[in-house]
Amino acid sequence: MFEEPFRWMEAISTRHSYVREKLKKGQPVIGVPYNEGAVIIGFSPQPGKIYEIYDRIALGGLGHPADVERLRMTLLDMAHAEGFNRSAKDVTIGRLLQFGLAPALKQNFEEIQRAPYLIQMLLAEINHEDTAEFFRVNYDGYWE
């Protein structure tokens, strides 16, 4: 009974190692700000690494295509619900991450019976001052 927290911590550490090893093989996504917005470039020969989420929000994904698509659809649904319930100006990456995506990713990662998302995302937002903001989201819900 006393070793259960240790087992959980060991399982989390193993999951971190597993996901990092899988993501090493992926093709990167790079975001660059410029005067009139931002550019997101994907280096994968496969289509479908860069998406528009909402009017001024874009997503670049690295990882398993099914996980990228599932989280893209989640972000898309959240953004449209937020825009419908409040206003289009209230749809920001900060709100989408803090109240929707990050808690879901964290919960999924910490449930050791489930497979973790194999994903790392770059989100770009052109704010109302026309400057670009970038956020990196990890598989465990951590974002910066």
Give the residues covered by each predicted segment:
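Long, low-complexity N-terminal extensions
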Residues: 1-144
